[in-house]
Amino acid sequence: MRSASRLGTAQDVAIGAASAASAAFGVQTYQVRVVATSACRVRIGDGTPIALTTDSYLPADCPEYFTCTPGQRIAVIQESAGGKLSVTEVE
């Protein structure tokens, strides 16, 4: 069981055939919670990362937590269909 965390800033990123990146994470953000409406591939990185079809697989409707560094972003690309990636900063 996962311990409780404080939810911070949330944003949605469109999932499509081309990579799309989120806004930069806040200065106190070391973890993000993500959930997608359709299967996709994700990459977290500095600057503006570009998600590739060989990056980490995220199935639809399965919340996942990732460690990050303040100022990083998450990029997403569809597996087979478009959708929405919900990204929530966790404090």
What do the PLM-derived regions correspond to, one by one?
Residues 29-32, 67-83:
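Noncatalytic modules at the cell exterior or secretory-pathway interfaces
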Residues 35-54:
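Short, surface-exposed beta-strand/strand-loop-strand elements in extracellular ectodomains
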Residues 41-43, 75, 86:
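General beta-strand recognition
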Residues 1-3, 31-33:
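Predominantly extracellular/luminal regions of secreted and cell-surface proteins
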